[in-house]
Amino acid sequence: MHVPFVNLTIQFAELEEELVQAFRRIGHTGQYIMGPEVEAFEAALANLCETKHAITVGNGTDALELILRGYNIGKSDEVITAPNSFIASAGAISAVGATPVFVDVQDDLNLDPKLLLKAIGPKTKAIIPVHLTGNPADMDAILSIAKLHNLKVIEDAAQAIGAKYKGKMVGSLGHAAAFSLHPLKNFHLLGDAGFISTNDDDLANTIKKLQNHGLINR
């Protein structure tokens, strides 16, 4: 018997009428890029993550890359991350010209804080802990080490939307977080998408410019 890996048509059938109504509503506005629907969605995401800002982007990889660019991380810099994540975690680091440095994981499959100190060097600029399968990394330890070495902490929360760490929402713990809304994620859109959550006003303003070629309100 063939068992499909995933069958999104079942969910589509359940939501078809709502999706058609939404398509018509947006279609009649003539505003297919950004606009009030996206602004309302971003506000809801910020509320969910308990952050000041949520900025929608093309996908989770874009989210990571834009955060790195927003913090001017690039050529000759190093960024620490976990080796057992999807290739996008390291790929986003490479895309900005930086070098991914892998630190092994502990039994919960998340970045092992005890190994972080050995990996931090003069070129290290950030740590990207990956909250694998919705299980948050040991953020208290990671944030403490990052603060000691003046490093940015960028949460890879692609699989962890809605998760909590000691009562606090994933996405609100580090300097910024990247989320994926890919159809195979636990919370997804009809197509591919992602978003960034942050409480950093300067970063949010920079990403909003990077998000659309420097254009504002267009």
Roles of regions detected by a PLM:
Residues 1-31:
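N-terminal "arm"/small-domain region of PLP-dependent enzymes with the aminotransferase-like
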Residues 9, 21, 36-44, 48-54, ...:
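PLP-dependent aminotransferase class I/II
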Residues 31-78, 92-96, 101-103, 168:
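Phosphate-binding glycine-rich loop
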Residues 49, 74, 122, 171-172, ...:
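Structured loop/turn residues at beta-strand edges in well-structured enzyme cores
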Residues 69-157, 164:
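PLP-dependent aminotransferase-like
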Residues 160-166, 173-218:
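Active-site region of PLP-dependent enzymes
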